[in-house]
């Protein structure tokens, strides 16, 4: 048996956490031969800690052969101790009448503290995925608060947007998602992100040629993917938890086990490619191998695409400016 991998999960008793933990413990994220130790963080309030205890009881009752151990805590330094993978799911949700900038600042406090805790106690090769929104900026804050860890260890989740875009294209074309490749979602995990199928193929044939409808792209496809989260809240009465958990598993699985040459979308610190300032955490197409991701470089950007990329970058720059004073 392999040595267990330590997986830290914040917001572990929340809706996404509940949809995530059982799949990690069953081996869906890291493979059916990889034992895991779950290190679970919840808020230091009685209700959250009691809920966490209940989730841990259920995990025990599944008798997962790969679950080598569990820790439940309200202390980030306990949760992140020697963590190989950290899924930062917990974030302050936007309350009624709350401005986006207030939400940014509330979350900045959380992710500054979590970045510092990771910096202090996590494995030096920890792979961090930020799921809690605003994910790109929260990942940026955590990265900046962990100066001893490599910036490339910090990523934000755009895989949900990527998967949503694949599904919309599948419906439009009547083709299965399994045969689709070379889709990319650029930018921020927000309604400004830009799902781009110019390079994408379905069973080897160009998707752009098959659709050949720029009006559908601009007026239906892009807004549908961008507003899908809001549509689910409207329909379900609460936010997309199972699909977010599924995307987190996809993101980490590909990062750790490799994407076999396929493009996947990850929010990663820019190296200056495509005119995105260095260090901004931005959605790019990447391929992954041996636990490392590589940006897909030199894709042509047409005027239509540039407009969307500029817009999502402007939003990220504005968010970054809004928290700059907290990062020294």
UniProtKB/Swiss-Prot annotation:
Residues noted as binding substrate in the record, renumbered to the chain: 94, 100, 133, 164
InterPro entries according to UniProt: L-lactate/malate_DH, Lactate/malate_DH_C, Lactate/malate_DH_N, Lactate_DH/Glyco_Ohase_4_C, Malate_DH_type2, NAD(P)-bd_dom_sf
Reaction(s) catalysed by this chain's protein: (S)-malate + NAD(+) = oxaloacetate + NADH + H(+)
The keyword Ligase belongs to this UniProt entry's keyword annotation: no
Chain residues that bind NAD(+): 11-17, 107, 114, 131-133
The UniProt record lists the keyword Oxidoreductase: yes
Catalytic site: 189
Assigned EC number: 1.1.1.37
Keywords from the named record: NAD, Oxidoreductase, Tricarboxylic acid cycle
Annotated GO biological process: malate metabolic process; tricarboxylic acid cycle
Residues passing through the membrane, by range: none
EC class name: oxidoreductase
Pfam (any one): Ldh_1_C
GO terms of molecular function: L-malate dehydrogenase (NAD+) activity
Record NCBIfam families: MalateDH-SF1 (TIGR01759), PRK05442.1 (NF003916)
Stated role: Catalyzes the reversible oxidation of malate to oxaloacetate.
Protein name: Malate dehydrogenase
């Amino acid at each position: 048996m392999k040595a267990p991998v330590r997986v830290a999960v914040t917001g572990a008793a929340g809706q996404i956490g509940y949809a995530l933990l059982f799949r990690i413990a069953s081996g869906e994220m890291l493979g059916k031969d990889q034992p895991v130790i779950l290190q679970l963080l919840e808020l230091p309030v009685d209700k959250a800690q009691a809920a966490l205890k209940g989730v841990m009881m259920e995990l025990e009752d599944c008798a997962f052969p790969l679950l080598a151990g569990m820790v439940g805590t309200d202390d980030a330094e306990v949760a992140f101790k020697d963590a190989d993978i950290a899924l930062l799911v917990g974030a302050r949700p936007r309350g009624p009448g709350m401005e986006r900038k207030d939400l940014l600042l509330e979350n900045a406090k959380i992710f500054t503290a979590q970045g510092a805790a990771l910096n202090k106690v996590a494995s030096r090769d920890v792979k961090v995925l930020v799921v809690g929104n605003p994910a790109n900026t929260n990942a940026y804050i955590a990265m900046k608060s962990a100066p001893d860890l490599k910036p490339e260890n910090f990523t934000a989740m755009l895989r949900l947007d990527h998967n949503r875009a694949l599904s919309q294209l599948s419906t439009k074309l009547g083709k299965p998602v399994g045969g689709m490749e070379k889709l990319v979602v650029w930018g921020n995990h927000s309604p400004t992100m830009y799902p781009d199928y110019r390079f994408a193929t379905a069973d080897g044939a160009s998707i752009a040629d098959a659709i050949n409808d720029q009006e559908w792209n601009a007026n239906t496809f892009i807004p549908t993917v961008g507003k899908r989260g809001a549509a689910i809240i409207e329909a379900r009465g609460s936010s997309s938890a199972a699909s977010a958990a599924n995307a987190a598993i996809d993101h980490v699985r590909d990062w750790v086990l490799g994407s076999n040459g396929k493009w996947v979308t990850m929010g990663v610190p820019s190296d200056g490619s495509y005119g995105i300032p260095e260090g901004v955490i931005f959605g790019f197409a990447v391929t992954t191998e041996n636990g490392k991701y590589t940006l897909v470089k030199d894709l042509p950007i047409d005027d239509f695409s540039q407009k969307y990329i500029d817009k999502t970058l402007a939003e990220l720059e504005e968010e970054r400016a809004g928290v700059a004073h907290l990062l020294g």
